[in-house]
A protein has these predicted regions:
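Intrinsically disordered, low-complexity segments in eukaryotic adaptor/regulatory proteins
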Residues: 1-253, 258-260
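N-terminal interaction/assembly modules
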Residues: 1-47, 52, 293, 311-313, ...
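Core residues of folded domains in eukaryotic genome-function proteins
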Residues: 2-5, 9, 15-17, 24, ...
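Solvent-exposed, acidic/flexible segments
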Residues: 131, 135, 139-143, 147, ...
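Secondary-structure boundary elements
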Residues: 265-360, 366-375
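Hydrophobic/aromatic-rich core segments of domains that either
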Residues: 364-456
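Catalytic cores of secreted or luminal carbohydrate-active enzymes
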Residues: 437-503
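Beta-strand-enriched, solvent-exposed domains that form extended recognition/catalytic surfaces
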Residues: 505-741
């Protein structure tokens, strides 16, 4: 006898455990008859089919059926004869209405009211280790405990505020009464009263600020303890489910999952360095395109339970990495810093799900850990120091300043770092119009950008910015000390995104000038990035925003040049005051550079430059165009090959000839000569530019011995008009040391 097979798990269906046949003649086990997306148990009267795809034989709940509008009522199955409805049609209508009521009641009981519309998720099937009902029940228990905690917080805040107001009132009355007595005796005047009120106000505000800070720290500590316990309970639910599925191979619809379940540990493993790099997991974020799009779509709507949120986020995930990615992108898109909460916020509302943000007791890292527990992922919160806003190279980490918190999540068999707060980038598009005042208008103008560097960051890169309290959570083979962390160069995420590295592995954040007053920084560039990376720099005093010394720009004491696959910054320190060198970079295409449009540079690293003594006179470089010296930019951006001088510095006599060969058509070469203390107009006759076929020849006749700067400009043969004008673009520059006999 041929037995029917379950459409979900493919195993035989026996009469005692059979659902069906359905309209498409398919059968299910009772345990398999669940929503394909969220895992909600279904009944004959409550299941839905995909009406947009007749080949889709899966079953869905009303909230997740992938129709154009999954919340439309099910069409009444009525038939008409001679324009009249048949009795069967009326029965069908009543049956459809009853089915809709059943679905509404079922979803209300399970707290699955979610925002509409849902994103259209296309994948092979959602596989969840934990039963939906069991996870929802546990979340509701957690929610009640959390409600009690926040009620306690509100009561404590009320009592604390009342006590503060009483103490403040008593203090003011006493101080003002004392002033009144002195005023009556003539030992005080009106001006002194104003000073007294001002001092009392400052004292009151400071006291309130201190009380608020202490209260928030206390509430944050209690909330974190609660969430940690709840995360353990949620992960224990996953552990039990995985163990049950491993013991019973015939259970449910997760045969493929049960085979891989033992690979994920039931308890958090100890911190160990990763056995492979991030590049072994992925090299292009395009692999997460679908996961990211779902997260962005969900973030623009609201959900009422963490269970529904996480199940929808990871519905298309096929690995632990993709689950963590979905949570990371949802948090980085959800702009927690500007969320506005009503005072009468309902705890079971969509915004109530994030009420910890309102109370200041929950942040990116705590929320990330909570969501990871709902996805069955081990996650820890790590505390320590970070080189965050306001930090400058050379600073010491003392007390509570520059304290920070981040996460480590266990995916792909290793602990990996995640920093959701630094990964979030919410930029308002200024082109959309003037600055919007309302939060909703600002939200509409957000461009959802993020920093992928802070997702699964390699430990050898993460240590440049973050130092944990526990050395084991450096995830390094050889952990470093806090002093070593302070001495590491101060870099930003773009440094690693552009594939940069320091050619001197012992380079420190504070660089001491040599006996000649020179300090060198050499940055290596990956071959892939060397053709489109453009660098810039800024030099100012370390302890102020001043950028000039004795009327001269400090930039003129820095020489930037390129050599092979590296960029070199040579600083000729003109003062004993400490300096701050900020190095910028940006990836720019040749086409964009040739337009002459401004380029927005971003900081990649900073250094403190120190010169203990300066018994010499530093001569500033000639006032040339900003940017690197030497012909490498000419070749990189203009295909202009240097034939005679490949270095940035030319040592010559009174006469010098510089030759280039054009590898693509260029037109209208212009060369300008500069020298300190000499008007550029007096040097125009000293330069002659000639183009012969593909050869570009620049002849120089230097009038006096000394140092000169040569700027070379050009444009493409096919002119590009900017505001109706043909602009020349800076091509390269040389530094000439001339000896004239």
């Amino acid at each position: 006898m041929v037995k029917e097979t379950c459409h979900r798990c493919g195993k035989a269906v026996y009469p005692t455990d059979k659902v069906g046949p359905l309209k498409d003649s398919s059968y299910f086990h009772h345990g398999c008859f669940k929503c394909y997306i969220c895992g909600t148990r279904l009944a004959i009267k409550t299941y839905c089919n995909n009406r947009d795809d007749i080949d889709d034989r899966e079953v869905y709940c009303a909230n997740h059926v992938p129709n154009a509008n999954p919340h439309d009522p099910i069409p009444n199955r009525t038939s008409k004869l001679n324009g009249k409805s048949t009795p069967n049609a009326q029965n069908d209508s009543r049956w459809a209405d009853a089915g809709m009521q059943d679905m509404k009641i079922a979803h209300a009981m399970k707290a699955t009211q979610v925002a509409k519309p849902y994103p259209k998720i296309k994948h092979e099937g959602a596989k969840y280790a934990v039963d939906y009902d069991a996870q929802t029940r546990l979340e509701l228990i957690h929610r009640r405990v959390e409600d009690d905690l926040y009620r306690t917080f509100n009561e404590e805040r009320r009592r604390e505020l009342e006590q503060f107001q009483e103490e403040t009132k008593e203090e003011w009355e006493k101080a003002l009464a004392d002033f009144a007595r002195r005023y009556e005796r003539g030992s005080a005047n009106t001006d002194q009263k104003e000073d007294l009120v001002r001092q009392l106000t400052i004292k009151r505000d400071r006291k309130l600020e201190t009380l608020t800070h202490r209260r928030k720290e206390r509430e944050r500590h209690k909330t974190t303890e609660l969430f940690d316990r709840q995360a353990v309970e949620m992960l224990d639910l996953f552990r039990q489910a995985r163990q049950t599925k491993q013991e019973d191979r015939n259970d449910d619809y997760e045969e493929s999952y049960s085979a891989s379940a033992p690979s994920y540990p039931s308890t958090p493993p100890p911190p160990q360095p990763a056995v492979c790099s991030k590049r072994n997991i992925y090299t292009d974020t395009a692999v997460f395109e679908h996961i990211d799009q779902v997260a962005i779509s969900i973030a623009q709507s609201d959900v009422s339970t963490f269970t529904d949120l996480v199940r929808t986020l990871i519905s298309g995930a096929r690995s632990d990495v993709e689950k963590a990615r979905a949570i990371y992108r949802w948090i980085t898109v959800k702009n927690l810093n500007v969320m506005v909460f009503d005072n009468d916020l309902e705890n079971d509302s969509p915004m109530g799900l994030l009420r910890g943000i309102k109370y200041g007791t929950e942040s990116y890292h705590v929320l990330f850990k909570r969501l990871c527990s709902y996805a069955g992922l081990h996650c820890v919160v790590i505390k320590g120091y970070s080189k965050s806003a306001g930090y400058q190279p050379g600073m010491k980490f003392l007390d509570t300043k520059f304290r920070n918190t981040w996460n480590a999540v266990y995916v792909d068999g290793n602990w990996r770092f995640v920093q959701c707060n630094w990964g979030a980038r919410h930029l308002v598009n200024a082109k959309d119009g003037p600055r919007q005042s309302s939060p909703q208008q600002q939200e509409n103008n957000l461009r959802y950008s993020y920093d992928d560097h802070y997702f699964l960051t390699p430990s050898e890169e993460f240590i440049y910015e973050f130092f944990p309290n526990e050395p084991a959570w450096q995830l390094l083979e050889r952990p470093i000390s806090l002093e070593q962390f302070e001495r590491l160069p101060f870099v930003r995420s773009l440094f690693f995104r552009y594939g940069l590295r320091f050619t001197n592995p012992r380079l420190e954040s504070v660089i001491h000038a040599d006996d000649n007053g020179a300090a060198n920084i050499s940055i290596g560039i990956d071959r892939e990035s060397s053709n489109n990376l453009i660098f810039h720099y800024n030099l100012r005093f370390y302890d102020s925003e001043e950028t000039e010394v004795e009327g001269l720009s400090l930039k003129r004491f820095v020489m930037q040049s390129s050599l092979n696959n590296s960029v070199l910054f040579r600083v000729h320190v003109p003062t004993t005051r400490p300096l701050l060198l900020d190095v910028f970079a940006n990836a720019v295409s040749t086409e964009h550079y040739l337009t002459g449009q401004p380029i927005k540079f971003k900081s990649v690293c900073k250094f403190k430059i120190v010169c203990d003594y300066a018994d010499y006179v530093m001569v500033p470089l000639p006032s040339c165009a900003s940017g690197e010296w030497g012909p490498r930019k000419a070749y990189r951006l203009f295909n202009l090959l240097p034939c005679t001088h490949e270095d940035a510095i030319i040592n010559c006599g009174q006469y010098c000839e510089i030759r280039f060969k054009m590898l693509k058509p260029l037109a209208e070469f212009v060369a300008n000569l500069h020298r300190n203390g000499v008007d550029d107009r007096h040097l125009q006759r000293c330069v002659q530019t000639t183009v012969r076929g593909d050869d570009v020849i620049i002849n120089l006749e230097l009038p006096d011995e000394g140092q000169y700067g040569l700027d070379i400009y050009t444009r493409e043969a096919i002119p590009t008009l900017i505001n109706g004008k043909q602009l020349l673009t800076h091509c390269c520059k040389y530094l000439l040391n001339a000896r004239v006999e």
